[in-house]
């Protein structure tokens, strides 16, 4: 289970206004659920565009300083400047503990890294089991860490002494200094210069997906270049045979969703189509229906990505409930990524082990709150317009693929 990003808070970004909105305790699969136009894609957009390969270490260098996409003019919340856009990253206390212990061992001053000193230092910064590290999005800059943003006027002597001990771990040849000017800010800076706040590549899968023609570059996850990429892992060179494992894994998933143990993908030499061997027939993938076409694309994108953060817009499009559940099971069990998903599917809310966040629009601003209890998830369903009476009080039920199909049923 890979968890690269543990928590994120945003201020003045898109639909999120000056009231800071936070989501924390991320897991492998994280769901942002809400009705249309509630702003549920704001977190995904920020992760994909602004946190791609983020590293605190790169803030002070010319290498890696620029995010994937600079803030656009319409990214700041209405009436606010780009400089007002802030983001906070959640850093678990245990990661800070690890950094301090490793540094003490390296500098042979482990006696300073007593459990009590480490506890007092981190508790002074922490909100529960984590520390929020705040940055400005434009220009990219460090702003503050933890509770020091509260401008506390009094600090207990034992905290001051513990902080000095931690400072001496990072600055073994230094003496003197003060708590406010040296020991605390320099200790925080040294912790953040470690790898504890470095994120991998982030990938964005849009809601509109379509397998592109041959010869296109596989540069994004819209479907362009997918045929050529699958052909590459179907028959890799002798030095890259390990890539075929991914192709076999996608085939196993195809067999799971079709219920046919013989189902197999094939990319022909002309690369005009993705073909499927199934039930002693050879068919283009598109002939199996939009749902199978869609879910195989998603599985391929997420299998090809390795140890990355993947943001997916509305994966439920064209998928009936069983396929939605199978997709979530596949992502959790067979891939190595962390997922952030914007959805309005009630089916996905019940994904085992997923962190769910309820996104709604209140007084014109996007609000985000956790939904971990049955009552909180019920409120999501109510907000989405789901009602038990929609099914219970119906005389009969006819399933259709979309609203446009209703025109065929007017005389039924």
Predicted regions and their residues:
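P-loop NTPase switch/coupling surface
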Residues: 1-216, 245-246, 252-268
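Switch/communication elements of ASCE P-loop NTPase nucleotide-binding domains
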Residues: 1-59, 249-391, 395-397, 406-411
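Generic amphipathic alpha-helical segments used as scaffolds and interaction surfaces in large
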Residues: 192, 237-241, 339
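Short, histidine-centered active-site or binding-site loop motifs used for metal coordination
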Residues: 209, 230-234, 278-280
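Short, glycine-/Ser/Thr-/acidic-enriched flexible segments
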Residues: 210, 404-405
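A solvent-exposed, charged loop/short amphipathic helix patch at secondary-structure junctions
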Residues: 219-236
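Alpha-helical coupling/stalk and coiled-coil linker elements that connect catalytic or binding modules
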Residues: 231-252
């Amino acid at each position: 289970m890979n968890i690269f990003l543990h928590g994120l808070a945003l201020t003045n970004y898109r639909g999120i206004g000056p009231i800071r909105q936070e989501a924390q305790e991320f897991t492998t699969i994280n769901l942002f659920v809400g009705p249309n136009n509630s702003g549920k894609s704001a977190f995904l957009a920020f992760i994909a565009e602004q946190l791609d390969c983020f590293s605190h270490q790169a803030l002070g260098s010319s290498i890696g300083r620029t995010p994937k996409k600079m803030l656009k003019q319409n990214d700041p919340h209405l009436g606010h400047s780009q400089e007002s856009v802030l983001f906070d990253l959640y850093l678990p206390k245990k990661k800070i503990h690890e950094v301090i212990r490793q540094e003490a061992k390296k500098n042979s001053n482990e006696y300073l890294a007593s459990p009590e000193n480490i506890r007092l230092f981190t508790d002074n910064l922490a909100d529960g089991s984590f520390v929020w590290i705040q940055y400005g999005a434009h220009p990219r800059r460090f702003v503050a860490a933890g509770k020091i943003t509260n401008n506390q006027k009094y600090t207990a002597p034992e905290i001051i002494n513990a902080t000095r001990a931690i400072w001496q771990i990072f600055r073994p040849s230094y003496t003197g200094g003060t708590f406010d000017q040296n020991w605390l800010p320099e200790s925080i800076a040294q912790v953040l210069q470690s790898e504890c706040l470095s994120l991998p590549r982030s990938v964005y899968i849009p809601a509109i997906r379509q397998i592109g023609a041959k010869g296109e570059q596989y540069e994004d996850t819209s479907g362009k270049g997918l045929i050529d990429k699958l052909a590459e892992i179907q028959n890799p060179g002798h030095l890259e045979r390990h890539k075929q494992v991914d192709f076999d894994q996608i085939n196993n998933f195809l067999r799971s969703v079709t219920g046919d143990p013989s189902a197999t993908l094939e990319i022909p030499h002309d690369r005009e189509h993705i073909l499927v061997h199934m039930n002693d027939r050879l068919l283009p993938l598109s002939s199996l229906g939009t749902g199978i076409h869609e879910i195989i694309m998603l599985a391929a994108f997420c299998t090809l990505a390795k140890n990355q953060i993947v943001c997916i817009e509305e994966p439920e499009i064209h998928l009936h409930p069983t396929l939605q559940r199978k997709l979530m099971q596949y992502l959790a069990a067979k891939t190595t990524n962390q997922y952030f998903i914007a959805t309005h599917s009630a089916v996905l809310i019940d994904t085992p082990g997923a962190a769910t966040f309820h996104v709604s629009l209140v007084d014109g601003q996007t609000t985000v709150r956790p939904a971990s209890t049955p009552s909180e998830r019920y409120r999501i369903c109510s907000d989405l317009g789901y009602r038990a009476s929609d099914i219970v009080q119906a005389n009969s039920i006819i399933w259709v693929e979309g609203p446009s199909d209703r025109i065929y049923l007017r005389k039924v």
